[in-house]
Amino acid sequence: MDYTPRLQPARLIKRYKRFLADVVTPEGETLTLHCANTGAMTGCATPGDTVWYSTSDNPKRKYPHSWELTETQQNHWICVNTLRANTLLYEALLENRVEELSGYSDVKTEVRYGTENSRVDLLLQAPDKIDCYIEVKSVTLLQHECGYFPDAVTLRGQKHLRELQQMVSNGKRAVLFFAVLHSGIQQVSPARHIDSRYAELFTEAQRAGVEILCYGSTLCPDGITLTHKLPLLG
């Protein structure tokens, strides 16, 4: 996924009201950015970090600038825009870069499924294959050399695990895909210490046959690419 035009840098002053952040540009101008991330963003929003932002040409947007990446003071790169994870996997599927999900001729997005009024992130179909339902999660929380999901209690994420497990019960293929969008993360684990119920449902879903895939990425102001498989812990 390319950023066109290239992202612009600024220094983070603070994040507030969940969806907003104030930054100062190299020229000294203060801007308010939109932040498309409802999580805690632990370790991703430290004042003084370098923020990389995009600018929309939509005149109707109240906040035309969007926070895309954080370059931390520890030299890690993090994609904080959770909307990018789906796009990254979609592009990787079209380019046949995820071996475990290859061989499907049709990729659909936001298809209704399940029993809890959900829309699946991606649905893969092919005449000779079982339908494959994929939920995509962005992993950005780094603690003790491990990446954790979620970074806050997520009822929505719990629902998705139930829906995926139901798809397996219905004879379909179901995949939980962790897109690791933090350059410092080399392994992934469910965050039992943050959302114990999510971790319980994660274990139940995995035992029921839901597949778990974790892929790392390369990140820079020019773009992001899913590149390599990462190990899953517990």
From Swiss-Prot:
Coiled coil: none annotated. NCBIfam families: sfsA. Pfam families: SfsA (PF03749), SfsA_N (PF17746). InterPro entries: SfsA, SfsA_C, SfsA_N. This is Sugar fermentation stimulation protein homolog. Belongs to the SfsA family. Transmembrane segments: none annotated. CDD domains: SfsA-like_bacterial. The lineage of its organism: Bacteria, Pseudomonadati, Pseudomonadota, Gammaproteobacteria, Enterobacterales. It comes from Pectobacterium carotovorum subsp. carotovorum (strain PC1). The gene is sfsA. GO terms for molecular function: DNA binding.
